[in-house]
Regions:
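Sequence/structural signature of beta-propeller domains
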Residues: 2-308
């Protein structure tokens, strides 16, 4: 039986159908890419694959962020709704936390449960964005806007701090002057301060013996470029020497080994690691000597994570 040829009407409908299908496919791809970009799946995909290659022994010797679960989830820091929590640091001597507020400059001391113990105005600071605890009651504070690092002394009776009373160090220019040094942590093993530029994310070191005197000048780390959209904060795990690097824009917390290689990560989105809501803008992270992790987010949210 002979095959009946397509009529002109049928022939014209087929290309139009194929064209519509092609446009719908392009739209679906564009939507999927936009969703992946917005949810930062592009950041996490490679990290997840890298995690699969870590051996059980390597996981045991690391912080291993996938095992952490939020036990304090977005607790409000009272009276700080308009102050913009910018960083967080653990003090092993007092077993308390210190946080800097960037919008209205002050230093606050917190319990490990996020209760406020005292607030200390930071007189002379313009935009304090990073803080770390060093030795003997010393804290290093970074003013991002003025590119200055100050090393201050905080004692039990301290009620306010005046920047001009303490040593200051010029951090120099940044590739993006408006997205300069926003992260700092004390590295006691290597006797240095570890500094982080926000964007493009990069790590620097500055030698120190833990006193108010820094040696030489800051040095950019060869392996200090991070594959995140920005760098918000840094912390050093006192047990392993590994670095925690926080990115607010990527909604990620990374664990890096002492060679700067990524070991594990935590995603800061709702439904992951016990979070009931996405952390809106994580700006500070620290870890205590028991391995508990603490974070602050703008405007005034407090988080505590414990290993399960």
């Amino acid at each position: 039986m002979a095959t009946r040829p397509l009529s002109p009407a049928q022939f014209s409908r087929r290309p139009r159908f194929l064209l519509r299908w092609y446009y719908w496919l392009l739209l679906a791809v564009a939507v999927a890419y936009g969703l992946a970009f917005a949810m930062h799946w592009d950041d996490r995909g490679v990290l997840w694959v890298q995690e699969r290659f870590e051996s059980p022994a390597e996981r045991k010797e690391s912080v291993w962020l996938p095992d952490y679960h939020a036990v304090i989830d977005g607790k409000l820091l009272p009276g700080m709704e308009k102050d913009e929590a910018s960083d967080l640091a653990y003090n092993p001597q007092t077993k308390t936390l210190f946080s800097v507020m960037g919008k209205n400059p002050f230093l606050v001391e917190l319990t490990l449960q996020g209760e406020v113990l005292r607030k200390m105005p930071l007189m002379g600071w313009s935009n304090p964005e990073a803080v770390t605890v060093m030795e003997n009651g010393l804290l290093a504070i970074v003013d991002e806007r003025e590119h200055l690092l100050s090393i201050v002394k905080v004692e039990a009776e301290t009620r306010e701090l005046h920047r001009d009373a303490f040593p200051k160090y010029d951090l120099g220019p940044s590739e993006d002057q408006n997205k300069a040094f926003e992260a700092i942590t004390w590295d006691p093993r290597n006797q240095q301060l570890l500094l982080g530029e926000e964007r493009p994310a990069a790590l620097f070191s500055w030698k120190s013996d833990g006193s108010q005197t820094l040696t030489g000048s800051k040095q950019k780390l060869v392996n200090g470029e991070l594959d995140v959209r920005n760098l918000s904060a840094l912390a050093i795990d006192p047990r392993t020497g590994h670095t925690l690097a926080l990115s607010a824009d990527s909604h990620l917390l990374l664990e890096l080994d002492e060679q700067g290689e990524q070991v594990s990560f935590m995603t800061l989105l709702r439904g992951f690691n016990g979070l009931s809501k996405t952390i809106p803008r994580a700006e500070g992270v620290t870890i205590d000597d028991a391995g508990n992790i603490y974070m602050v987010s703008e405007p005034n949210l407090f988080y505590r994570f414990e290993k399960q």
